[in-house]
Structure formats: structure tokens, C-alpha cells
Amino acid sequence: MSFLVSKPERIRRWVSEKFIVEGLRDLELFGEQPPGDTRRKTNDASSESIAPFSKQEVMGSFLPEGGCYELLTVIGKGFEDLMTVNLARYKPTGEYVTVRRINLEACSNEMVTFLQGELHVSKLFNHPNIVPYRATFIADNELWVVTSFMAYGSAKDLICTHFMDGMNELAIAYILQGVLKALDYIHHMGYVHRSVKASHILISVDGKVYLSGLRSNLSMISHGQRQRVVHDFPKYSIKVLPWLSPEVLQQNLQGYDAKSDIYSVGITACELANGHVPFKDMPATQTLLEKLNGTVPCLLDTSTIPAEELTMSPSRSVANSGLSDSLTTSTPRPSNGDSPSHPYHRTFSPHFHHFVEQCLQRNPDARPSASTLLNHSFFKQIKRRASEALPELLRPVTPITNFEGSQSQDHSGIFGLVTNLEELEVDDWEF
């Protein structure tokens, strides 16, 4: 029994902000903080998020006490059913938040170690495009992780419920710009993210883009020295197989580095533009072989799909594999109430195609860094801040902001709220 009781205590010491932020940063175990005023700027619109948050802004003075949070509707499960995700209200301010409660008693030692790594980076990272943990603490034998509620959900939620054939290019540019800013910071801190995908891109009510999935981050710092490559294979990697780079999947002595995240950005770009991830529904072994043999996904539009396929009968369309040479049965969306049109009868800019091609280079050394990609011509179309433009570009989608009737003692208004929340893949947010 003492072995089980020690698990919450084992996590508790990692939750201490002083232990993680001050102690470990002083020991220089996690690389150097990127200098705020010496970093190269991109264009004016993209330079807004270079400066990190202040610690006060990140934590938002949320108290680490269970009694300060009124747990409302359960909106998800996860982490092998050991995690319950609640919509909650922070009592001192009335703000609605998301609370992850993880049963530490039932966690294996491997899971506890996994959670420790997540808490490490959540306390260490401090950037406007990385989802902040508002509070982390132990309540009884549960680990509570409090984050802001993301009213637009994840980018995957958006393409699954509203943009089934993909988003428009400008919206994707805003989203990927936020992702690359976060990755640039993460890479300078000496980490590889290893789980960049649409479900780990969260969008707040005011249109701000956040990268989550910190649980999969891997440090490239060993014994105070930054390693050229790492060899660790991601845990639970079957869920992120379509996004993983060939060099990660090879698991050979050459290893991989931060450029593996750039490949994942390219796959995510295809996911957002095509409405589904490349290699979707492929068996794992086939996906592995396709990647190792050099198969490169692409954006699906008039420049990559033969003209005869764009005009063929509505019963055929591009396959769920996300590769332009595969066909399967599908029903294209009707156009203007007339005859159905091909969903990919559109044309993305040459800059967008080139951006994706650069990200998906088979040789990782040929891929640009995150900081280089932020200066790519693809982002020249951005003229405003994401918080100003993205909500307009996501119309007719409206953020979930009406929480009336969601209190646990008042069931009259819960049904509509839960119906909306169930459309969000909260399990995949991973915060």
C-alpha cells in the first residue's frame, strides 16, 4: 500500500514551481532561454509573439486548491481512462476553465514518469503560443491540471465538423505561423516536440493559436550538453504515426533532431488543407513502408489532381490516404445547389505548395528550421494579428461561450452544451 501512496507524493514534488523553474533552470538542464531582444524578427504581423509571457500572465494567479474550482460537465476521458476532463468554473473570478483530473493511484510507474516529464516542460516553457497551465496541484490522490477553455477547440475539431474538405489558405497560414513560433521556441530550449498535429493545435475564443501535446516532448540536453541527435522512440507512437518523420520511424543509429518536427508541420499543413491527414486509414506497416520509400504527400488541388479526375462522376473522389494518386468512393459537396462539384476543385498558391515541399524533404538536413520557415513567402499574405483575423476566417464557426445551465446542480441547460462539447475531441488536446 505504501508503494501506491508514494505515487501522489512523487508527483507532488514535481508540481512545485520553485523546484522545477528555479532549481532546474539554475542547473541548466534544459538549455538556454532564447534571448528576447536578439532573436531575428519576421514580418511585422508575425513578430507579435516573440517575447515570452511574464510568469504572472502565464499562471494568471489561479490558486492551486481544489475548493476554488466548481466542477461542471464531464467533457472527456483519456490517458487510458485514468483521466477525466471537466468543464469547471474558477470561483474567485467566474472564469470557465478545463480541469484534467488524473487518478495517480491507478497509474503505473511508467505513466507517473510520463506525467513528470509533462510537468517539467509545462513549468519550464513560457511562450504566448504554447498552452499555459494555469495551475497544477494534487487533490487527494488526483493530479489536477487547470488550463483555459479553448472555445474553438482544436484545429482537428474544426476540420472534422465544419471544414471537411479543408480550410482556406489564409486561415491555415495564421494557424501554422502560431505553431512555428511555438516550435522555434521549443527547439531553442533544446527540445523536440514529436507530436505536432491538428488535434494539438488549440484556438481560443479570441482567435489565438496554441500548441499543446507537451507530454511527448523530448529534451536533447544530456549532462548539460546539447546532443546532435536523439534516439528515443515516442511512447504511444501508433497514435501519431501519420505525422512522424521517416527518420524517427527508422529507429537507426543516425537518430533524429528538431527537423523531425518540421516534417510533422508539413503533414499537418496537408491535414488542414485537405480535411484529413495523409496516410489516413492505412495499416501501420504500409504507412511505414510508404514513408521509408519516399512517398511524399501533397496539397490536393487543381495542380496536383489530374483534370479528368476533377470532372469525373460525383461517386469518385480523392482517397482518405491523402495521396493524390489514390481514388475511392466519396460524395463531393454540392455547389450552389446545382450538380455536385469536386471538393478539391480549388487552387492553392505556389508559395503554399513550396512551403509543404520544403517541410516534407526526405533528408532532414534539407528541411528549413522553424525560424527560417517563419520568413517563408507563404506567410507574406498575413497582414493582421491572428486574434483579429482568425475568428473571421473561421466563420460560420462560432466559439462555445454560452455556459448557462452547465452547473452540476442545474441540468436544464446541460444538454445543448454537452452536445457541442462532444464534437470537440478533448481527449486529443493533451494540453
Swiss-Prot record:
Superkingdom as given in the UniProt entry: Eukaryota
Any GO BP annotation: protein export from nucleus
Modified residues (Phosphoserine): S2, S46
Subcellular location: Nucleus; Cytoplasm
Alphabetical list of InterPro entries matching this protein: Kinase-like_dom_sf, Prot_kinase_dom, STRAD_A/B-like
Spans annotated as Disordered: 310-347
Complex and partners: Component of a trimeric complex composed of STK11/LKB1, STRAD (STRADA or STRADB) and CAB39/MO25 (CAB39/MO25alpha or CAB39L/MO25beta): the complex tethers STK11/LKB1 in the cytoplasm and stimulates its catalytic activity.
Primary role: Pseudokinase which, in complex with CAB39/MO25 (CAB39/MO25alpha or CAB39L/MO25beta), binds to and activates STK11/LKB1. Adopts a closed conformation typical of active protein kinases and binds STK11/LKB1 as a pseudosubstrate, promoting conformational change of STK11/LKB1 in an active conformation.
Pfam families from the UniProt entry: Pkinase
UniProt GO molecular function: ATP binding; protein kinase activator activity; protein kinase activity; protein serine/threonine kinase activator activity
UniProt note: domains: The protein kinase domain is predicted to be catalytically inactive.
Gene assigned in the entry: STRADA
Disulphide-bridged cysteine pairs: none
Predominant location category: nucleus
Chain ranges of the Protein kinase domain: 69-379
Membership in a protein family: Belongs to the protein kinase superfamily. STE Ser/Thr protein kinase family. STE20 subfamily.
UniProtKB keywords: Cell cycle, Cytoplasm, Nucleus, Phosphoprotein
Keyword Lyase: no
Compositional bias annotation for Polar residues: 312-339
PANTHER family named among the record's database cross-references: SERINE/THREONINE-PROTEIN KINASE FRAY2, STE20-RELATED KINASE ADAPTER PROTEIN ALPHA
Modified residues (Phosphothreonine): T329, T401, T419
Protein name as annotated: STE20-related kinase adapter protein alpha
GO cellular component terms, A-Z: cytoplasm; nucleus; serine/threonine protein kinase complex
